Curated annotation (Swiss-Prot):
Native source species: Geobacillus kaustophilus (strain HTA426)
InterPro entries noted in UniProt: Aa-tRNA-synt_II (IPR004364), aa-tRNA-synth_II (IPR006195), aa-tRNA-synth_II/BPL/LPL (IPR045864), Asp-tRNA-ligase_1 (IPR004524), Asp-tRNA-ligase_1_N (IPR047089), Asp/Asn-tRNA-synth_IIb (IPR002312), AspRS_core (IPR047090), GAD-like_sf (IPR004115)
Oligomeric and partner information: Homodimer.
Family: Belongs to the class-II aminoacyl-tRNA synthetase family. Type 1 subfamily.
Full protein name: Aspartate--tRNA ligase
Length: 590
């Protein structure tokens, strides 16, 4: 029989109607003579009743049924008695009187409860992912992902973009994370790489006159994983010709507005706020600040420059800084022991200590209060807008450590003090990034974004004299403290690209060998162009209110980049290795 309704969509208006439903058994209850079955499909649950008064055959089948059996149920929709109405489900006012129950397939007892409140460990859920996906919250997340992707496609189609696929087997490049390599059977000893992004190909599409490109692109990076990282991930990849930075930012904002409207039914304010990279680091201690709450960092270096507290004075004298955050009204909540724990937390980010003061009436009290003159205390009170009951936390060190420690502490306190509105979506642009970052250990510069980012025009001469001072025409989109994506205007002239390669330590031969095809393409009339790439997995995570990226992906990898379901990666046969002209050499400790 053909299905007539999905389980969660049988309406009250169907009372009296004969229906056919198909799905899985969520729960079976035998009440002595009557058997109740909660039948579930991807839309929800409906209650099925097997009664000897209606069908002895259906009752006999229901007696055999167990959790997760697959059924086809034929019966009549009836209204529930008022006292049995279930307001927690969409079909709670009706039930199905079963006239025929067909067991399509049986099921072993699942290793965990197929429900949103399951207590199964994540590794068990990942091993039996096909069961985990039956949980309503997992299906809803995948459905949201589909809706977001469809909205993006519809929006970009309306803006005259073409969706174009770029190669998955490409060339390994030395910048960025480690590549996943694929050996070539046809070319012994040579390798393809899986793309870390379609960056070069989308730029070549601009050279090719496409002008407006996008792709829901699969990308691969062999890097250490965190809760919001995966070895294979999906990005919304966009490139445009003949544009300026404001054009891409405007397009992205309009696209995000459409996505949020489709996903959550709300309108988000535009334009998004914008701050520079330097301002983000100064005010929030982060290049991806969560602006849903205040608790900003305040520089008090000049106030304490000549103080008797040598930890502060010495830090300023040696070129560092002293910054503080004011946790309003938090002094009574944090004991000395609690503050010591905050100090240990700050120590994980390089801070050598966490100094503190509490505001009690008109006085500042704490272990370091005695070191400050009345004038210095008054200046601190003004700078930090101190009121009775405030807790002041200080870090003194080099700028990078101060930013890292206080930035992390700010987020921790924001959560502990309930300052974050979890329902809010706070988009933010971070602009004016440095083009290059210097690695002290390796003694060379790295691209802050990638080697194809256009420098600010006036800064191009500095590539050869003072690379650290060069600004990038780059921009990151941040949402609730997560980097949602980044973009830039691109280099489109060969001489500028060659200067960039030299600043990154490439010899002329290395640049030609790795990127000769791109440099040559720039000699054939390349238009000015730029773009952005937004993390789809992360966007879904944030809009779904999840905290783990793995919950937004149908078949994700673990933190060790393995698949517990298929047991990938795994060994291959000697014959396969021989065909690829490869031999496995394991590390000695293995």
């Amino acid at each position: 029989m053909e299905r007539t309704y999905y389980c969660g969509e049988v309406p009250e208006t169907a009372v009296g109607e004969r229906v056919v439903l198909k799905g899985w058994v969520q729960k079976r209850r035998d009440l002595g003579g009557l058997i109740f079955i909660d039948l579930r499909d991807r839309t929800g649950i409906v209650q099925v009743v097997a009664s000897p008064d209606v069908s002895a055959e259906a009752l006999a089948a229901a007696e055999r049924v167990r959790s997760e059996y697959v059924l086809s149920v034929e019966g009549t929709v009836v209204a529930r008695a008022p006292e049995t109405v279930n307001p927690n489900i969409a079909t709670g006012s009706i039930e199905i009187q079963a006239e025929r129950i067909e067991i399509i397939n049986e099921a072993k007892t699942p290793p965990f409860s197929i429900s949103d409140d399951t207590d199964a460990a994540e590794d068990v859920r990942l091993k039996y992912r096909y069961l985990d996906l039956r949980r309503p919250v997992m299906f809803q997340t995948l459905a949201l992902r589909h809706k977001i992707t469809k909205t993006v496609r519809d929006f970009l189609d309306s803006e005259r973009f073409l969706e174009i696929e770029t190669p998955m087997l490409t060339k390994s490049t030395p910048e960025g994370a480690r590549d996943y390599l694929v050996p070539s059977r046809v070319h012994p000893g040579e390798f393809y790489a899986l793309p870390q992004s379609p960056q070069i190909f989308k730029q070549l599409l601009m050279v090719g006159g496409v002008e407006r490109y996008y792709q829901i692109a699969r990308c691969f990076r062999d890097e250490d994983l965190r809760a919001d990282r995966q070895p294979e991930f999906t990005q919304i990849d966009i490139e445009m010709s003949f544009i300026e930075q404001k054009d891409i930012m405007d397009l992205t904002e309009r696209m995000m507005a459409a996505v949020v409207k489709a996903a959550k039914g709300i309108d988000i304010p535009r334009p998004f706020p914008r701050i520079t990279y330097d301002e983000a680091m100064s005010r929030y201690g982060s290049d991806k600040p969560d602006i849903r709450f205040g608790l900003e960092l305040v520089d008090v270096s000049e106030i304490v420059r000549n103080s008797a507290f040598q930890v502060f004075a010495r830090a300023v004298k040696e070129g560092g800084q002293v910054k503080a955050i004011n946790a309003k009204g938090a002094a009574p909540r944090y004991s000395r022991k609690d503050i010591d724990a905050l100090g240990e937390f700050a120590g994980r980010y390089g801070a050598k200590g966490l100094a503190w003061l509490k505001a009690e009436g008109e006085e500042l009290k704490g272990p370091i209060a005695k070191f400050f003159t009345d004038e210095e205390q008054a200046a601190l009170r003004r700078a930090l807008a101190v009121e009775d009951g405030d807790l002041l936390l200080f870090v003194a060190d080099e700028k990078a450590i101060v930013a890292a420690a206080l930035g992390a502490l700010r987020l921790k306190l924001g959560k502990e003090l309930g300052l974050i509105d979890e329902a809010k979506l706070a988009f933010l642009w971070v602009t004016d990034w440095p083009l290059l970052e210097y690695d002290e250990e390796e003694g060379r510069y790295y691209a802050a974004h990638h080697p194809f980012t256009m420098p600010v025009r006036d800064d191009i001469p500095l590539l050869e004299t003072n690379p650290s001072a060069v600004r990038a025409q780059a921009y990151d989109l941040v949402l609730n403290g997560y980097e949602l994506g980044g973009g830039s205007l691109r280099i489109f002239e060969r001489d500028v690209q060659e200067k960039m390669f030299r600043a990154l330590g490439f010899s002329e031969e290395e640049a030609r060998r790795q990127f000769g095809f791109l440099l040559e393409a720039f000699e054939y009339g390349t238009p000015p162009h730029g773009g952005i790439a937004l993390g789809l997995d992360r966007l879904v995570m944030l809009l779904a209110g999840r905290t783990n990226l793995r919950d937004t992906i149908a078949f994700p990898k673990t933190a060790s980049a393995s698949c517990l379901l298929t047991e990938a990666p795994g060994p291959v046969s000697d014959k396969q290795l021989e065909e690829l002209h490869l031999a496995v050499v394991l590390p000695e400790n293995e």
